Regions:
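FAD-binding core of FAD-dependent oxidoreductases
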Residues: 11-18, 53-68, 253-263, 305-306
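Hydrophobic alpha-helical bundle architecture
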Residues: 25, 269-282, 292-306
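Short, Gly/Pro- and small/polar-rich lid/capping loops
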Residues: 1-14, 19, 92-96
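A short glycine/serine-rich beta->alpha loop
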Residues: 2-11, 45-55, 245-255, 296-305
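Acidic-glycine-rich active-site phosphate/pyrophosphate-binding loop
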Residues: 29-43, 225-244, 276-295
Length: 306
């Protein structure tokens, strides 16, 4: 849970690319003059049409540019949280100067990101694969600094999924039987994702599904029930993050939408039936672990975003 359920700002595919770009720029030690980005088909597809937090723009070029300009790899999936208007203007200039080249890389893991930065005679190269924050290879000027591929971390199309194999019974027993104080931390997911939903309702993000569902026509045709409450709260948080709002959410298995879907329907229903805190904690833990369990079979990157 601690490994898979972490905060993220923005859609995790372009943010993961920004993370690789930030790491490559840090290793280079200079502002890159050229940036080459090689991506798996799923990363390329999932990142093409979503909003980048705080920019009002969509797609990979601005994510890559900002990653090299203001990104800090230590921030993980919150790599772009130091964005300023000045940095955004610089990022737009990098795109206009055509310093970024993005291409498809075949026969690699579904989640594969490679960024090569250069300035003068110096170069750096960073590879993320299998997981959104999993840096497996770092190189500077032809010298390998890190190569976790030698440790059995595969980045080809046949790479194995997580070594830990969960079962339904294991997940259920853990959620139902663990001492409450040891799993109470899962309430952080409810707190963060609820704030994202509430912030979304103060603006007009994405398709404004939440406002439609809870508005006059939504209530007329869909009713006012526990189901519509769950739908409205969940859609609010998803709309905001997919539209590029600077709102952090708690992700699951590298997906903000999966983290939201594992959290907010449970929280909304718990509030509707006024259940105990213990029941909410155990339900949230079961929900998040079930997502991780299911992703073992589906793979970390699905055909659709989230």
């Amino acid at each position: 849970i601690h490994q898979e359920v972490i905060p993220a700002i923005g859609c995790t595919e372009p943010v993961a690319v920004a993370l690789a770009a930030a790491k490559a720029a840090e290793v280079l030690g200079h502002r890159p003059e050229k940036i080459e980005v090689l991506l798996s088909a799923n990363i390329l597809k999932n990142a093409m049409g979503v909003g980048i937090p705080g920019t009002g723009m969509v797609g990979l070029p601005i994510a890559v540019a900002l990653g090299t300009l203001i990104g800090k790899s230590a921030y993980g999936l919150e790599v772009l949280r130091d964005l300023t208007p000045e940095a955004l203007a610089e990022g737009k200039q990098v795109i206009e100067d055509k310093r970024i080249h993005i291409a498809l890389k075949d026969n690699v893991d579904k989640l594969y990101i490679e960024v090569i930065c250069s300035a003068g005679d110096e170069t750096s190269r960073v590879i993320i694969c299998h997981e959104h924050t999993n840096v497996v290879y770092v190189e500077k000027n032809g010298v390998v600094l890190t190569d976790r591929r030698k440790e059995g971390v595969s980045c080809d199309a046949s790479g194995d999924e997580d070594e830990l194999r969960l079962s339904f019974s294991t997940v259920y027993e853990f959620a139902m039987e663990m001492p409450l104080d040891e799993i109470r931390f899962i309430l952080e997911t409810a707190d963060l994702n609820r704030k994202a939903a509430e912030a979304s309702l103060k603006g007009n993000f994405g398709h404004t599904v939440s406002k439609t569902v809870s508005g006059v026509y939504g209530r007329k045709y869909m009713g006012d029930s526990a189901y519509t409450h769950m739908l409205a709260m969940t859609a609010a948080a998803c709309d905001a993050r997919m539209d590029g709002a600077m709102i952090p959410v708690m992700s699951n298995s590298g997906s903000g939408n999966q983290g939201i879907a594992a959290t907010l329907p449970v929280l909304s229903f718990a509030e509707d039936i006024e259940c105990t805190e213990e029941l909410l904690i155990r339900a949230l833990m079961l929900s998040h672990l079930m997502v991780i369990y299911i992703k073992q079979s589906l793979g970390r990157l699905s055909a659709l975003c989230g």
